[in-house]
Amino acid sequence: MASTEGANNMPKQVEVRMHDSHLSSDEPKHRNLGMRMCDKLGKNLLLSLTVFGVILGAVCGGLLRLASPIHPDVVMLIAFPGDILMRMLKMLILPLIISSLITGLSGLDAKASGRLGTRAMVYYMSTTIIAAVLGVILVLAIHPGNPKLKKQLGPGKKNDEVSSLDAFLDLIRNLFPENLVQACFQQIQTVTKKVLVAPPSEEANTTKAVISMLNETMNEAPEETKIVIKKGLEFKDGMNVLGLIGFFIAFGIAMGKMGEQAKLMVEFFNILNEIVMKLVIMIMWYSPLGIACLICGKIIAIKDLEVVARQLGMYMITVIVGLIIHGGIFLPLIYFVVTRKNPFSFFAGIFQAWITALGTASSAGTLPVTFRCLEDNLGIDKRVTRFVLPVGATINMDGTALYEAVAAIFIAQMNGVILDGGQIVTVSLTATLASIGAASIPSAGLVTMLLILTAVGLPTEDISLLVAVDWLLDRMRTSVNVVGDSFGAGIVYHLSKSELDTIDSQHRMQEDIEMTKTQSIYDDKNHRESNSNQCVYAAHNSVVIDECKVTLAANGKSADCSVEEEPWKREK
């Protein structure tokens, strides 16, 4: 009793816990702010290193230009880590396109895939037309071209003319490759050749041909030969991205229709996609060094940078202002109008992809990084990104359309050619279509510029005058292309979210039904086994269990508590 009272009189210990927010810190607030900044930089370490690499490459390149002329081998060694980065990124393009398209489309039905593709194409065409029209308006308003520039820059190099019809037919041919393996490293192109054709009389009569040869030896003028332009199809180096995308879109849709039969293949490509994305993460940690070396090497290799900047400064400003307006105002505005979400928080999520595009100048090379930014940072459904991004990296080139429209009218202004309304519309439409057909590789805009200049009858040799500044503008327009693809994925995901949720609920219901069927089959099997176990001793009156005899009841299912030891046990 005394012990009980002593226990009751003991002081009770009460543990009081307070939330961290109620505790005052002795550390100054500015230190907390600094620690928060360090924590944020730590979480975004890769992004911070990439931005630092861009700045470091530009600063080092500018300082090295001030030094004495650098040997080309030294420049090559400086840019070598950047070349390795580009090779690694391009190495992943093919497996990433294959796995992403198949896994994205196999999880959708045919109707959902069609709606997804329609929304993406409407967005692509709309933004590309807006970019081309913006470029035309800016170049006409600023008027950077001047006939005096043509005299300062000198004549350009002669280029082969390209037919718009041939380019369009090549686009369709590449969409349907005859050999899928060959499409991984080659694409088809129409080539025009000038061939000397002898007159028919020379071909028909061998005697006259011999006489003609004798006349040539006797310094007599032979019959004139004709120059005939012949067209032919040739394969050129470069991945046929358009053909691969077309095939694997059809492959993914067909696999999605097969349902459970293709489950093993879907799992295989899902695993392949995950492996590729893990490789992407490894390469991204190398990208700050590679991007710094790429930019530094490019700046060192430029000849007469100051002279080029003075001569083509207004042209560069026109293109850059147009890209900033389109990528910084129009695209975020379209995203906000459609989704009613903050476009700048969206841009913060894709900043890593934007910086990578600025350094590599390749939409296809940036594709692995763009996948990771949209899926991990912004939480966009993989079925959307895996379909929208590969297609967008190939045909959605807003920055390229704007650049080509500005460049074409700039060349016209340099040559003193005044374009009428019809020609300006032609430039806008051709720039839109040419940007869609441009391959997602560096400096593809210069190649497609031939189409636009040929369409309005401008000299194609003047394209070579713009090569000196294309290294910078190519990076700027590629970064806008990547931003446009990313905003497009966000818009398509917002418009398709309800349909994707419906598909997910249907899949869950189907899985529940399959699980219920499996459980019922399992229960039936167990029930049959239990019945068979109960009846196994039905023909016996007693059994021996643990050295004891158990007498069974008449029904053979239960014992009447008649348990006795065996006689020899009792005798012991």
From Swiss-Prot:
Na(+) 1 binds at G392, N396, N481, D485. Glycosylated. L-aspartate binds at A361, S362, S363, T400, I441, P442, S443, A444, G445, D474, N481. GO terms for biological process: adult behavior; cellular response to cocaine; D-aspartate import across plasma membrane; glutathione biosynthetic process; L-aspartate import across plasma membrane; L-glutamate import across plasma membrane; L-glutamate transmembrane transport; monoatomic anion transmembrane transport. It catalyses: K(+)(in) + L-glutamate(out) + 3 Na(+)(out) + H(+)(out) = K(+)(out) + L-glutamate(in) + 3 Na(+)(in) + H(+)(in); K(+)(in) + L-aspartate(out) + 3 Na(+)(out) + H(+)(out) = K(+)(out) + L-aspartate(in) + 3 Na(+)(in) + H(+)(in); D-aspartate(out) + K(+)(in) + 3 Na(+)(out) + H(+)(out) = D-aspartate(in) + K(+)(out) + 3 Na(+)(in) + H(+)(in). The modification Phosphotyrosine is found at Y537. Keywords: Amino-acid transport, Cell membrane, Chloride, Glycoprotein, Lipoprotein, Membrane, Metal-binding, Palmitate, Phosphoprotein, Potassium, Sodium, Symport, Transmembrane, Transmembrane helix, Transport. It is a multi-pass membrane protein. Na(+) 2 binds at T394. Residues 1-28 are annotated as: Disordered. PROSITE patterns: NA_DICARBOXYL_SYMP_1 (PS00713), NA_DICARBOXYL_SYMP_2 (PS00714). Sodium-dependent, high-affinity amino acid transporter that mediates the uptake of L-glutamate and also L-aspartate and D-aspartate. Functions as a symporter that transports one amino acid molecule together with two or three Na(+) ions and one proton, in parallel with the counter-transport of one K(+) ion. Mediates Cl(-) flux that is not coupled to amino acid transport; this avoids the accumulation of negative charges due to aspartate and Na(+) symport. Essential for the rapid removal of released glutamate from the synaptic cleft, and for terminating the postsynaptic action of glutamate. This is Excitatory amino acid transporter 2. The lineage of its organism: Eukaryota, Metazoa, Chordata, Craniata, Vertebrata. The gene is Slc1a2.
